């Protein structure tokens, strides 16, 4: 989808910038701000009529940077917790990515298909099939990403309850995905 990886990446790196700044990790905060600048510039040229495309390599780089920053944040939360809801907020920030990956792998493996075989069972393909289009699909997934982040802010201190709600939602969605 046009701008999907960049839009989700923009949301994730915005939250990560704040979290790294709270932890005093200015080098990582600057890295996140740099990626935000690159993604905003990319989005400017990616919307209709699109003149630049991210492709597989670009989305892999964005995903790699998200993974590195996520691991660093988890390391920070468990070595020097500054904010009590940090791990929950970090998970909520990347929830859409984790959920889509888990859902697709579950569907493929349960159908006896290799999890590495390409198909159209990802969330954005499902949304496009519902006649929302590329921009609509990007907006819906970005809105859900922001919704999960906003929901964790008041619930984040209740780690066990947040974890149970998360597991319940994932279980329901995995069951209904077939």
What are the residue ranges of the model-derived segments?
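Alpha-helical transmembrane segments
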Residues: 3-130, 134-178
């Amino acid at each position: 989808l046009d701008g999907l990886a960049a839009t989700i990446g923009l949301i994730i790196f915005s939250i990560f910038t704040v979290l790294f700044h709270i932890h005093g990790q200015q080098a990582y905060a600057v890295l996140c701000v740099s990626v935000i600048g690159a993604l905003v510039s990319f989005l400017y040229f990616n919307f209709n009529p699109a003149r630049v495309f991210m492709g597989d390599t670009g989305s892999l780089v964005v995903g790699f940077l998200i993974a590195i920053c996520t691991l660093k944040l988890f390391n920070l939360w468990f070595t020097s917790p500054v904010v009590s809801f940090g791990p929950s907020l970090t998970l909520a920030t990347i929830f859409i990515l984790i959920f889509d990956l888990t859902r697709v792998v579950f569907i493929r493996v349960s159908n006896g298909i290799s999890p590495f075989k390409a198909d159209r069972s990802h969330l954005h393909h499902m949304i496009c099939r519902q006649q929302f289009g590329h921009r609509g699909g990007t907006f819906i997934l970005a809105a859900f990403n922001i919704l999960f982040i906003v929901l964790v802010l008041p619930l984040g201190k209740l780690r066990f309850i947040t974890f149970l709600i998360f597991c319940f939602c994932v279980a329901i969605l995995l069951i209904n995905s077939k």
